[in-house]
Amino acid sequence: MENTHAVHNGIFNYLNEIKISPLSRAYTFSDSVYEVIPFYNFNIIAFDEHITRLDKSCNSLSFKADIEKIAMEIKQLIKKSNLKNGYVYYQISRGIDPIRSHMFDANIQIETFGYVVEHAFK
């Protein structure tokens, strides 16, 4: 875990260094979307399809996500890991509330989080 590459709100770090707020709507309400994106022999599998689905999921929940920036983050995460085979788990939540509430501010800033792990495909 200490050498697992991760990104949180655009800041790259190791997974054990990432700090997620307990008031994240991903944590309190599961108010988030995610995608698991595999790569094999340094090639991302069906990347455009994964990004399109992630974008559609964000739009369906009215998340204001910069999908181009997110796509670049995912590619950077894979590159930083220097892994040949693995997958990226990438999650986008509505954001962090000042206090837990079912109602949310329409202008809340989304929260992004992802990490990459090695996986032996068989």
What are these regions (language model features)?
Residues 1-122:
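Conserved alpha/beta cores of soluble small-molecule-handling proteins
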